[in-house]
Amino acid sequence: MAKEKVIISRSGFTNELGWEIYFRPENNSEKLGDLILQEGSKMGMIITATPSFRGRRIEAGLLSAGQDFTNETNPFSVGLGRFVDLDKKNFIGREALVESDKRCKSWGVRVVDGVASKGETLKFNGKLIGRITSSTWSPFQVCGVGIVYLNNSDLGPGTIVEVECTDGKTHKGQLCTLPMYDPKGEIVRGTNKAIPSQPEPWGGIKKL
């Protein structure tokens, strides 16, 4: 690209049909940037930033290292157990994983008329049950969306919770599975290229 060697990947932090371009320190980033802007403008491309696509990351259940999972969690507790092969012998950490709790403690949450405050607590019937690890507003679902980590695995999708929000108030929310929609990953695979013409509000808002 622009006579520069880069890595172009179909992986992404948004679960959308797109591309990631990885630069090297020695790359001429200004030249590459100019080329991308020049060619992109022909297709209506606009410049945006992380906050604009954070919602899709959360809705897709793409966990952020150090935020949604840490060195204090294990793959099973954050819903990544499918990537662990305990039949494989002699790998680092295997014994700890064999003995670990295999139940999931990480779920999505939809919030009524508010955005959950990241790092704040999550309550059920007034009792502390976990914390918010990621959150933002979803213009597509027209509600706050987030990822939570619970203190135990007794509660799960469908549970009505109390969420501390950025407006300083407590709003009601509902735990849900991840991803929140497109469970088969048809969008990122390009098998569903339909672009919604309007939002699809979360129906649960009227029920809470």
Residue ranges and their predicted role:
Residues 1-208:
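Conserved, structured C-terminal
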